[in-house]
Curated annotation (Swiss-Prot):
Mg(2+) 2 binds at E94, D115, L117. This is Fructose-1,6-bisphosphatase. It is an enzyme of class 3 (hydrolase). PROSITE patterns: FBPASE. It comes from Dictyostelium discoideum (Social amoeba). Pathway: Carbohydrate biosynthesis; gluconeogenesis.
Length: 346
């Protein structure tokens, strides 16, 4: 974008681009907090080698995962920056086991769920990582938060986004009116609009999945991956690209097309990814970019979680790829169900 037409995130949020966006000033304030948290996190990552912030913090989180030092820094940055906006009612973090309260004097009317540092297991080898967030209006009529405020259908989100800390630092977001990308200009310290109305290709030729788990997949997933790898029906074989950092894998899928998959399997029936702050916000972005996201039977955005850290299977990407995946799910899982019922009857 020309330096004569720099549109910063704050300027964009207040522009006429969002004539239909409710509470524009509140959203601008809230996103100023998110942008600040992302800048703090980005700076901590870039300086981690100098400040001995790589490696483990010596604790585990609610998921029994080893917590990295940078996980702690990013989590603290998001909590501090979000509370300071006075727009947040309560929060959910991937790093904490329960709802995070906000004092009544600071509380606003939005619920924010976030993964402060997705893919942090890759940090020590300098792989790109990210932050993910989702925003809902609060459900409570008073100042007392409850599970009803956070256990929400994805389709009821007000906004969602992710930050990618890679060769460049990007903030990608949606308010339900398309997807926009902002790149951090380190010279001026601002996120600047660089990607307007991002849209995924109708069909792609890249698949992204951890094939180390293939022995645990159901028949439908095994056969689908086998088909796209082999170039069945005379088509060109898909290329495999899997980083193991969800933000990085989704960002590539969004730009180049294709499909990202983290299915449930016999080892982890509900998959690995958490709904509120991973699957739901990235599904919202994918749908707003003309893509699709499913748990294998229904759209991810139509789900309502039963717990704040609930895990769900997910397949998302180019619509033609998802439609083909669902055809395999219908064919093979239906056949499996029919066979199982026949064996049971006999």
């Amino acid at each position: 974008m020309s330096s004569n037409n720099l549109i910063t995130l704050h300027r964009w949020l207040l522009s006429d681009t969002h004539k239909n966006m409710e509470n524009k000033l509140e959203m601008a304030n809230l996103f100023s907090g998110i942008a600040l948290a992302c800048k703090i996190t980005n700076n901590a990552i870039k300086r981690a080698g100098f400040e001995s912030n790589f490696g483990l913090a010596g604790i585990t989180n609610v998921h029994s995962e080893d917590v990295k030092k940078l996980d702690v820094i990013a989590n603290d940055a998001f909590k501090m920056a979000l509370k300071s906006t006075r727009e947040v009612f309560c929060m959910v973090s991937e790093e904490e086991d329960s709802i995070i309260p906000v004092s009544q004097s600071q509380a606003g009317k939005y619920v924010v769920a976030f993964d402060p540092l997705d893919g942090s297991s890759n940090l020590d080898c300098n792989v790109s990582v990210g932050s993910i967030f989702s925003i809902w209006p609060k459900a409570s009529k008073d100042h007392n938060y409850s599970n009803d405020d956070v256990l929400r259908k994805g389709r009821d989100m007000t906004a969602a986004g992710y930050a990618l800390y890679g060769s460049a630092t990007m903030l990608v977001l949606t308010f339900g009116q398309g997807v926009y990308g902002f790149t951090l200009d380190n010279h001026i310290g601002e996120f600047v609009l660089t990607h307007v109305e991002m849209r995924i290709r109708t069909k792609g030729s890249i698949y992204s999945i951890n094939e180390g788990n293939s022995v645990f997949w159901d028949k439908a997933t095994q056969e689908y991956v086998k088909a796209i790898k082999s170039g069945a029906d005379g088509r060109a074989p898909y290329s495999s690209r899997y980083i193991g950092s969800m933000v990085s894998d989704i960002h590539r899928t969004l730009l180049y097309g294709g499909i990202f998959m983290y299915p449930g399997d016999t080892k982890s029936p509900n998959g690995k990814l958490r709904y509120l702050y991973e699957v739901a916000p990235l599904s919202f972005i994918m749908e707003q970019a003309a893509g699709k996201s499913t748990n294998g039977s229904s759209p991810c955005l139509d789900m309502i979680p039963k717990s704040i850290h609930e895990r769900v299977p997910v397949f998302m990407g180019s619509p033609a790829c998802i439609d083909e995946l669902l055809a395999f799910q219908k064919k093979f899982n239906h056949n499996h169900s029919t066979t199982s019922q026949h064996e049971k009857d006999n």
